[in-house]
Amino acid sequence: DGKPGLPGPAGPPGPPGLGGNFAAQYDGVKAPDPGPGPMGMMGARGPPGPPGPPGAQGHTGHPGEPGEPGQTGPVGPRGPPGPPGKSGEDGNNGRPGKPGDRGAPGPQGARGFPGTPGLPGMKGHRGYTGLDGRKGEPGGAGAKGEPGAHGAAGSPGLAGSRGMPGERGRAGPAGPAGARGPAGPLGAAGPPGFPGGPGPKGELGPAGATGPSGAQGSRGEPGPNGAVGPVGPPGNPGNNGLNGAKGAAGTPGVAGAPGFPGPRGGPGPQGPQGAAGQRGLAGDPGTQGVKGDGGPKGEPGNSGPQGPPGPQGEEGKRGPTGELGATGPAGNRGARGAPGSRGMPGSEGRGASGAAGPRGPPGDAGRAGESGPAGLRGLPGSPGSSGPPGKEGAAGPAGQDGRGGPPGPTGPRGPSGEAGKPGDKGATGPTGLRGAPGPDGNNGATGATGPAGGPGEKGEQGAAGAPGFQGLPGPAGGAGEAGKPGDRGLPGDQGVSGPAGAKGERGNPGAAGASGPQGPLGPRGPAGAPGTDGGKGEPGAAGAAGGPGHQGPGGMPGERGAAGGPGGKGEKGEAGHRGPDGNAGRDGSRGMPGPAGPPGPTGANGDKGESGSFGPAGPAGARGASGERGEVGPAGAPGFAGPPGADGQTGARGERGPSGGKGESGPSGPAGPAGQSGPPGASGPAGPTGARGDNGPPGLTGFPGAAGRVGAAGPAGLVGPPGSAGPAGKDGPRGLRGDPGPSGPSGDQGMVGPPGPSGEKGPSGEPGTPGTSGPLGLQGFVGLPGARGDRGSPGGAGAVGEAGRVGPAGPAGARGAPGNLGLPGMTGPQGEAGREGNPGNDGPPGRPGAPGFKGDRGEPGSSGAMGLAGAPGPAGPSGGAGRPGNRGESGPGGAAGAVGPAGARGAAGPSGPRGEKGVAGEKGERGMKGLRGHAGLQGMPGPSGPSGDTGSAGPNGPAGPRGPAGPHGPPGKDGRAGGHGTLGSPGARGPPGYVGPAGPPGXPGLPGPAGPAGGGYDVSGYDEYRAAKDYEVDATLKSLNTQLENLLTPEGSRKETCLHAHPGSLARAVVVQGSNDVELRFTFSVLEDGCTRTNKPSRLPLLDLAPLDLGGADQEFGLDLGPVCFK
């Protein structure tokens, strides 16, 4: 080897750097030229000479062009674990557990208040017609009519001899009906008639106002889980999770030159005590302390909002009859109801005879008719000759029953009984199943780099040899100076919980807190023990008059009341329908002889007289056969309600109704005695990262960690002076918190010692504070495509697509929901009489349709045969449950782990999706009666009652006044269609959409600039660190392409995105109703590629669906809205 030459000139700029992996540039080789010569042309590269000593540092070359990316270096040593990531999204709820063992029956609850009466049931089926009543007494004679006009004088005849009086002539035809006189004064009310047969079922009335809550029903079976509620507020931080899975390898670090291992340094002197750390995170909960004495009873809290209505309790015992309340004032007069359909003729009534009407105006003179019957007694006419006495007529038929009076107003509600005593404490429920662990959190950000140690003293220059094998550790060096206090270390292991403290003294009662937000509805506790019946309360003061209540059912028939006084004069009634001709009344008593009239002219000889009148009525014949059923008579007055029927059998349990609205919180009760500690709840999801606490005191020394992987060789350290290794002392007890010491100076950085023996796995440490963001790593290779993400939120509205062509006709779909009212059809021909129909079931009440156009008046059909009475329809099932949430993928079941220690109780997670129906548990013993629940909603009207028995014949009614019935009036014209209703208020804001799918990986960034030139190295020995081959990037691109194609054809193939699609079929077409109640009707077309274009701006993403007329026992309804893209 020659002697070192003088420093040569600065070399040309070095070749491009190795993409940041190797920061080294090659130095210029020492030139033998002692003087600075001119820069020559760059010669061909000679064979490498033996390595000379390093030349002096050349000037830094200009940065080269960005080089090609270097080969991947070996994997760097594993970095310190990052801070814990943010809590992941809550995992899907596990499947519902098996039903728990049945709890012991709870004690009997206190008796509830009686509920308000339900609405009157539907009208019962018509009963059989009762027997005819006995014939009534003859009515009183009517007032005398005015004299008729004089007829024209006949031609004078010869005076004949007076003949014998002829026999009475036959009755002439009835004259025209006179105008109806004003109504007479109201007669005394007759006794109530027997209950008439129920009328036919009336039209469906308008929906009544929401009734008061009914009494608490019996406890229902547990309903299925409800739909997933909105995400609740973040729970309290849960316990530390298990250690996460091993993180992915970091980006490859720069390969350092292998250094010689220095001797192991001895332990330095102990540094000054560091400043007190920030307050650490909360430790694990300690063991449960001894139960303290009960505190004094707190003051009652502020009244909370009313809670949601509890589940329906069992029916309570019937309470004792309350004292009669004071009569309430009469309600306001109701609006005039719609005319009911014409009812069947009622049995004959017993109305009182009305007063005689006033005299009508005189009629026009008619042509002479046949001899009429004897008239009622008239005013004195012009003198005529006295007629012969007439014979007695037969008695007239009995008049119809008068209508019953309306029911009296409902009396006020009686005073409430005292509330029952609170029940005993219920038994503790079973422990819930442990929830599935949440998903792993994201990786935390890289921690900040620690400060570098101060430079050591410069060592002597050694000759650079080839890297040898790693030598044994040298002797320990002397102790270095005390270093500055390092950064805050990771939290130490959690100390053992201290013993429970002594029982504290009883504290003063705190002030009543404000009402907290209403918590979620807890599970229903077991029923409390029955309270003793309270004493009868004093009657309360009469309340203010309530609004008019719903008409209650008729009461039991009362005793016959005394006759009322005459009513005031009523308004003039409309002309009634013309009644059938009555039988002739009795002849009036013989009138006084009138004064003699002037002698008339002699008449001509009369014709032969008509045959005489009929003889007296014969005896009553035998009762004839029943006549055919007449037309439906006018609706009879409501009869008195019959006695309540026997309790029916319990109906089948209906499906669970939709969840009720959230009630207001009830007032907070006084604090109850402390309950027994409940079983530990399942671990809650990890809470959000808490604020940074104060530094905790230094933790105890932990056990040695497991052996780490062999890292890449570090750079050669400086040789330290050998020191003597001291023996390791035992861990002392945990000291008290010291005062913060001053910062010590920074010590030299010692060498990495050999790996210690593998220690036992320590408990999970508490999360450290997040470090600052580390430097940006190198660009990694494109990763493989990730798993398919959750469904994204809908995109913005897209451009209108072209209309697709109509596909083939599909098979006939199931029967659709009833359509809207169509246009009126043409008048059909008169149909034939239908045969007797079977009884139909009661249909569910329909919702009012849009008003139809006025139809033409149809021809009258022939009357059909009377149908049999229909059986009461079954109770309709409850409405469908709310939409089920998206069903999560069920993970494979893991093996059952050992039971862990009870964690602190986490906050309740959000409700899971509706689970599958659990196995029915065994039938338990009947529980005691539960506490009284809130009054339930008013029930639907009950089914029609059975037909009543035939009533007995009524007593004779007095004869009604005889009046001719007018003809039927023509039907009135249909009313005009009503206007559109007002706009509804906007609905509540929907829940937030699901998290969108993860986006595709970004394109690789530009290569970074070359690093600065470093010291030169001999790289001849580094071939072993090269990567075996380049990664296959093409495979990644291909998988990305497949992933994009899958995004374009969701849930299907390229040619058909819907299963069983039938383009052009409107069997299941949707009619969308806008917020302004306008129905948007379109003819839908589905193209084969799943795209639909439209230029109608109203075809926008749906915000809400409200299906109607669903829930029948034979109906199924499903809805699936697939992914929609609006371009």
Swiss-Prot record:
Keyword line: Collagen, Extracellular matrix, Secreted
Q: List GO terms (cellular component aspect).
A: collagen trimer; extracellular matrix; extracellular space
Cited InterPro entries: Collagen, Collagen_superfamily, Fib_collagen_C
> Region labeled Disordered — which residues?
1-1017
Q: What is its main location?
A: secreted
Composition-biased stretches (Pro residues): 1-16, 260-270, 998-1010
Sequence ranges of Low complexity compositional bias: 171-191, 221-230, 237-258, 272-282, 326-345, 355-398, 436-449, 461-473, 508-518, 611-625, 634-647, 667-692, 703-730, 758-778, 802-824, 860-872, 898-913, 937-956, 986-997
List each copy of the Fibrillar collagen NC1 domain by range. 1093-1127
Kindly list the cysteine pairs connected by disulfide bridges. Answer: none
Q: What is this protein called?
A: Collagen alpha-2(I) chain
